[in-house]
Amino acid sequence: MIKVCQCWDDGVLNDIKVVELCRKYNAKATFNLNPGLHNAVERITEGKTYLDTGHVPGKLAWNEVKSVYEGFEVASHGMNHLSAGVVDDKAFVADAVAAKNVLEDHFGRECRGFAWPYGRYTDETCQLMREAGFAYGRTTLYTEDVASYTDPMQLHSSTHFQRGDFWAAFEKARPSGVFYFWGHSYEMADDPALWQAYEDKLRRLSEDPEVEWVNVIDLVK
C-alpha cells in the first residue's frame, strides 16, 4: 500500500474545481488558507494575474469557505501570508496561530497543520511553531521518502503536481509508502488541458488498488 496526499495553497477561486474533482474520485485533500486575506461576503475577482495567462487567482469569500471545503482538511497558511525570517519571529508565529484559531472556530475542528508561505522557514520559527501547537509545516522542498522526516515542522513533499517527474516521483515513493504532492489551483488557470491532466492524475491514483488517500496531518500523527 502507498498513502497518497495532496495540498493546495491560498484559498483561491479555482479550489472550487479541485474540490469537485476530488469528490468525483473520492480523493482527500488539504487546503492551506489565509483567513486575513479573504473578504467577508464578496469574492476577490480582480488583482494581479498569474504569469502571462491573464488569469486572476482571486479569493473565495470567507462566508463560503466552510461550504466549499466541506469534508476536506484545512490548515493554516498564516493570516496574512507572512514570510518567516523576514518579519519578526514572534509576529510570524502570532500570525500563524491567529489563522489556526480562526480556522478552528470557523470549521469547528482542530487545525494543527501549516504550510510555510513562500516555502521559507528558520530553525527558530520551527521551534516556536512546534511550541505553539502545530504538528507539521510543509516546505517547498522535495524528497523521495516523505515518511522519513527528522522534523515534522520541515515536512517535504514528493513533488509539485505539474512537475514533469510526477509519475517518476510516484514510483520512487512506493518503497517509502508515502506520496505527497502540492500546488496552487490557479496554476491551471482556465486551461482545459491542464485541468484534464490533473483529473487524469486523480483518476489514475484512485484506480490504483495500492493507493490509500490520506490527509497531510495523517502523515505525522
List each language-model region with its residue ranges.
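Metal-dependent polysaccharide deacetylase catalytic core of the NodB/CE4 family, i.e.
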Residues: 25-125, 146-153, 178-188
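C-terminal active-site subregion of NodB/CE4 polysaccharide deacetylases
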Residues: 1-17, 93, 97, 104-107, ...
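Histidine-anchored nucleotide/phosphate-binding helix
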Residues: 18-22
